């Protein structure tokens, strides 16, 4: 491929991505833990039905930003968020926002699989029940089956859905947590290093699942694995020392980043 053709392809990809609407918009987002400032005026927009990877060295602020997107930072004593984050134009930090409803719309999958100490069925049905999404037992059964299918787990557990979720393998437990998240029909799914505790085979299954989920959900993933970010995301944002260094199409970020700090991090020169 000659340089002219490469430039044309890159321009076409940029144009295609620029037409994707924003699902969430972060404006001048700063986060404080007590007197310590962890994020500095971050401006980052999350595109709809797109996987956005947040990368950067430990302590750079990427997980702090992720938790700000569904107000999980509210659970940390002394944490304060400044700036503005909107979901479909609505300020998620507005005092009138129902935080429980927000977290149903913006689900979270954590670093370590954390199934409830209940059956597989109860793990998935819990959210729909408390949010009133099922009018009957048949409705609930359908939601559970559909969610487990979307998480790529149904065929592995359909004959034992009333057994404990904690008896599953680590990779299965993480997919159960993803099924639990999608059961309440979220619009956005946040993933905080979802594969860090998994073996390569389980990781591959979760990454394949992320590709499939992108068709119906907007996904934001924090990862320390550059290879994973390159494999699963369409957009990548680089954080360093609480600042957003740059955000761009993933292909460009990994081949021709705008900031030398991004290049140094990707090449393993620090982090």
From Swiss-Prot:
One Gene Ontology term, aspect cellular component: plasma membrane
Keyword tags: ATP-binding, Cell inner membrane, Cell membrane, Membrane, Nucleotide-binding, Phosphate transport, Translocase, Transport
InterPro entries: AAA+_ATPase, ABC_transporter-like_ATP-bd, ABC_transporter-like_CS, P-loop_NTPase, PstB-like
Domain ABC transporter stretches: 24-266
One annotated GO biological process: phosphate ion transmembrane transport
Main location: membrane
Membrane topology: Peripheral membrane protein
Residues that hold ATP according to the record: 56-63
Keyword Membrane: yes
EC number, as in UniProt: 7.3.2.1
Protein name, as recorded: Phosphate import ATP-binding protein PstB
Source organism: Rhizobium etli (strain ATCC 51251 / DSM 11541 / JCM 21823 / NBRC 15573 / CFN 42)
């Amino acid at each position: 491929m000659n340089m002219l053709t490469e430039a044309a392809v890159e321009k076409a990809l940029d144009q295609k991505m620029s037409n994707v609407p924003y699902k969430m918009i972060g404006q001048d987002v700063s986060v404080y833990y007590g007197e310590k400032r962890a994020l500095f005026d971050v401006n980052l927009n999350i595109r709809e039905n797109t996987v956005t990877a947040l990368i950067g060295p430990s302590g750079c602020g990427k997980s702090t930003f992720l938790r700000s997107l569904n107000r999980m930072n509210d659970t940390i004593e002394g944490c304060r968020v400044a700036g503005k984050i909107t979901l479909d134009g609505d300020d998620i930090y507005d005092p009138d926002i129902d935080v429980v409803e927000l977290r149903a719309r913006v689900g979270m999958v954590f670093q370590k699989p954390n199934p409830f100490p209940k059956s597989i069925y109860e793990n998935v049905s819990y959210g729909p029940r408390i949010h009133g999404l099922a009018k009957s037992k048949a409705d609930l059964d359908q939601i559970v089956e559909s969610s487990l299918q979307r998480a790529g787990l149904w065929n592995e557990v359909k004959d034992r859905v009333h057994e404990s979720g904690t008896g599953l393998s680590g990779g299965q437990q993480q997919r159960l947590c993803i099924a639990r998240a999608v059961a309440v029909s979220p619009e956005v799914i946040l993933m905080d290093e979802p594969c860090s505790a998994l073996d390569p085979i389980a990781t591959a299954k979760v990454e394949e699942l992320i590709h499939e989920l992108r068709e119906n959900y907007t996904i934001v993933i924090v990862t320390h694995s550059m290879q994973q970010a390159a494999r699963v995301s369409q957009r990548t944002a680089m954080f360093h020392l609480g600042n957003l260094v740059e955000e761009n199409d993933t292909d460009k970020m990994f081949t021709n980043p705008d900031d030398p700090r991004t290049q140094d991090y990707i090449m393993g020169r620090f982090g």
